Curated annotation (Swiss-Prot):
Pathway: Glycan biosynthesis; glycogen biosynthesis. Pfam families: Alpha-amylase, Alpha-amylase_C, CBM_48, GlgB_N. The keyword Ribonucleoprotein does not apply. This is 1,4-alpha-glucan branching enzyme GlgB. NCBIfam families: branching_enzym (TIGR01515), PRK05402.1 (NF003811), PRK12313.1 (NF008967). GO terms for cellular component: cytosol. It catalyses: Transfers a segment of a (1->4)-alpha-D-glucan chain to a primary hydroxy group in a similar glucan chain. Signal peptide: none annotated. The active site is at 408 (nucleophile), 461 (proton donor).
Length: 732
């Protein structure tokens, strides 16, 4: 039966007006259930409804339309425990739901305090969209809670496909002075799309994607998606082994991949299966992914992120990406992701001017804009922004089990005058150019990551001589495990581009990196940046015909793998792709089957496999990467023959001799000094016939006698192939 209530209680007209405009800071003070001397006042916001009833214990009480879509009634229950709202819509459709405005806040005081202090290390558990279940007297209620930080907003509402994107149905409340807006909405399920309608202090109204969204629509669509993980991990053994490993003293050979163009058309799971096979066949220990966080513009390669907490939906769901990582772990392959905390794009629907003011970006244009890229720079000194980023680093490690973060564009963060004209930057409090807030942020990120995740590696793309990038934070360093050695990359590629007859005049270019090889813990990169924008590829940088180019690439890679430091190679370079990389098409795998040059490409691919296998087998190539004691020159100055040679030492006492002939002529009886006499086995020869070389070599080994040479007590005559490399191991 239906009982007509004796009176309808209308709220203050000013409150109704604010509510109708989506600008009320506490809609829960109007909507929901409120005590009254004669019972309980129930109010509901149903702007398009034809009728609304409150259903209490099987009895329906009609609500009166008060104004602006607000319905209300006084019901004769002083201690109302529960009720439902029955809504009749145009066309006669009726639904019954719980009232989201009668639920307590989903964030506790401690959570809000920690966020306000910038110290909530699991921020993703309190902000964003979270599915919830409540057991109430009238039955179970399920739905989604939403929480977003927008301290300067005049009002925030949840909008989505569940309300026709109207923005009138679900205004949120602000929790105290934190600037966090919150609301629980019954009935919203995993997969539903949503945004926040944010009313700025300037009168602007913008529909914003959730900064903490765990999933998104497929670009170019921009909505956030409610997401719940049901994935069950299978990599406990991998994680335990990782925690017991010291990255600097372990083998690390990284294959850099842009997912969309490695083999186009694959999803996360298909890519994981095919990548695992390729990486196992080539022997890489890790894969590094260009940014996988959601980004609207594919041409940015992922470096203009709009949803920092969501793997791109181009290839599947967040659980599909979890499967991707899990599958590679099962194959014995670590996963590193590129992370972009330096800047973010100006898309109006994303982080930019989120609450109508500079919020995530610095308010000073001289610190808040990256002029080269047309992007905004994070305000690293703001506690909540710093918390957003530090928690994001932890999120990828906790939620997706990734094994490392390669931090992009670190130099742009460290210097206030980075790429700025004279007079276009503001000094720090000491009058210097260092961005002290960014330094503190990087230190906090690295210290927190390493405290919580032993064995995880953080890598800096830092292109200047900033001191202490890989020094521990407790002694003033930035705290990274490794830094890209951009100087090595520049000098080595420049040297190899010279014709062999001219290389002797540029010998210093190939040896200079050993002057500073232990100033930081380095990773040697031949990355995506070196095979685009007219730079060519490894193959096309080499002088000569295809035979000479193949030999040059093989020699370069052997030098790279034996040089102190870990190594990274961008996809396609492992088989010598001749065309520059483009994100718009896949790799030229067909070159492996080319009837004329395919042998060279297959030979290079085989060499990369053998480089990685030999590298892993010989601790001399990786256990002392960060110590000068792991390296010793035999001869760095043989410019006449265009030869350089050095020794690598392992913590197990093993010794390798690495010899490189960068001239265009072989040396038949090249005498090289060695630390001990005896048999030195040839463990790698880049000119071997299996690599499409000439087969010039040493028949498997040379014997060192007691004849001193190069300041060493022993020596041997070695056959050095033209444009080639030889590695030898002392047999004891």
């Amino acid at each position: 039966m239906t009982v007509e209530p004796p009176v309808a209680i209308a709220p203050d007209a000013a409150d109704l007006d604010l509510l109708s405009r989506g600008e009320h800071h506490n809609p829960h003070s109007i909507l929901g259930a409120h005590p009254h001397p004669d019972g309980t006042v129930i109010r509901a916001l149903r702007p398009h409804a034809e009728a609304v009833d409150a259903v209490i214990g099987g009895t329906s009480f009609s609500l009166e339309h008060l104004a602006h879509g607000v319905w209300g009634a006084l019901v004769p229950y002083r201690d109302l425990m529960d009720y439902r709202l029955s809504t009749t819509w145009p066309g006669g459709h009726n639904d019954v739901s719980a009232d989201g405005y009668r639920f307590l806040p989903t964030l506790g005081e401690l959570d809000l305090h920690l966020f306000g202090e910038g110290r909530h290390e699991r921020l993703w558990e309190i902000l964003g969209a979270h599915r919830r279940r409540y057991d109430t007297p009238d039955g179970t209620v399920t739905g989604t809670s939403f929480a977003v930080w927008a301290p300067n907003a005049r009002g925030v509402s949840v909008i989505g496909d569940f309300d026709g994107w109207s923005g009138r149905n679900y205004p949120m409340r602000v929790l105290g002075s934190t600037g966090v807006w919150e609301l629980f909405v019954p009935g919203i399920e995993a997969g539903d799309l949503y945004k926040f309608r944010v009313h700025g202090p300037d009168g602007s109204v913008r529909d914003k994607a959730d900064p903490m969204a765990f999933a998104t629509e497929v670009p170019p669509a921009t909505a956030s998606r409610v997401s719940v993980s049901t994935y069950e991990w299978n990599d406990a053994e991998w994680l335990a082994q990782r925690a017991a490993t010291e990255p600097a003293q372990s083998p690390m050979s990284v294959y850099e991949v842009h997912l969309a163009s490695w083999r186009p058309g694959l999803n996360y799971r298909e890519m994981a299966e095919q990548l695992a096979v390729h990486l196992t066949e080539t022997g890489f220990t890790h894969v590094e992914l260009l940014p996988v966080a959601e980004h609207p513009f594919g041409g940015s390669w992922g470096y203009q992120v709009t949803s920092y907490y969501a793997p791109t939906s181009r290839f599947g769901s967040p659980d599909d990406f979890r499967w991707f990582v899990d599958h590679l772990h099962a194959a014995g392959i670590g996963v590193i992701v590129d992370w972009v905390p330096a800047h973010f794009p100006k898309d109006e629907w994303a982080l930019a001017r989120f609450d109508g003011t500079p919020l995530y970006e610095h308010s000073d244009p001289q610190r808040g804009e990256q002029l080269d890229w047309g992007t905004y720079v994070f305000d690293f000194g703001r506690r909540e922004v710093r918390n957003f980023l530090v928690a994001n680093a932890l999120y990828w490690l906790d939620e997706f089990h990734v094994d490392g973060l390669r931090v992009d564009a670190v130099a742009s963060m460290l210097y206030l005058d980075y790429s700025r004209p004279e007079g276009g930057w503001t000094p720090n409090i000491h009058g210097g150019r260092e961005n002290l807030e960014a330094v503190a942020f990087l230190q906090e990120t690295n210290a927190t990551v390493h405290k919580q995740h032993r064995g995880v590696v953080t890598i800096a793309e830092e292109s200047t001589a900033w001191p202490g990038v890989t020094r521990a934070t407790n002694v003033g360093g930035l705290g990274f495990n490794m830094k890209w050695n951009m100087g090595w990359m520049h000098d080595t590629l420049g040297f190899m581009a010279h014709d062999p007859v001219h290389r002797s005049y540029h010998h210093h270019e190939i040896t200079f990196s050993l002057m500073y090889a232990w100033s930081e813990n380095y990773l040697l990169p031949i990355s995506h940046d070196e095979v685009v924008h007219g730079k060519g590829t490894l193959w096309t940088r080499m002088p000569g015909d295809d035979y000479a180019k193949a030999a040059g690439v093989r020699a370069l890679l052997a030098y790279m793998w034996s040089h102190p430091g870990k190594q990274l190679l961008f996809m396609g370079q492992e088989f010598g792709q001749t065309a520059e990389w483009s994100e718009e098409r896949g790799l030229d795998w067909y070159q492996l089957d080319d009837p004329y040059t395919g042998g060279f490409h297959r030979g290079l691919l085989r060499l990369v496999h053998d480089l990685n296998a030999t590298y892993r087998e010989h601790p001399a190539l990786w256990t002392l990467d960060t110590s000068p004691g792991g390296f010793s020159w035999i001869d760095a100055n043989d410019t006449a023959n265009n030869v350089l040679s050095f020794l690598r030492y392992g913590t197990d006492g093993s010794i390798l001799a690495c010899l490189f002939n960068f001239s265009g002529s072989p040396h038949a009886n090249y005498r090289v000094g060695l630390p001990e006499r005896g048999e030195w086995r040839e463990i790698l020869n880049t000119d071997a016939e299996i690599y499409a070389g000439s087969g010039w070599g040493n028949l498997g080994a040379v014997t060192a006698t007691s004849q001193p040479w190069h300041g060493r007590p022993a020596s041997a005559e070695v056959a050095l192939p033209a444009n080639g490399a030889i590695w030898m191991s002392l047999e004891r």
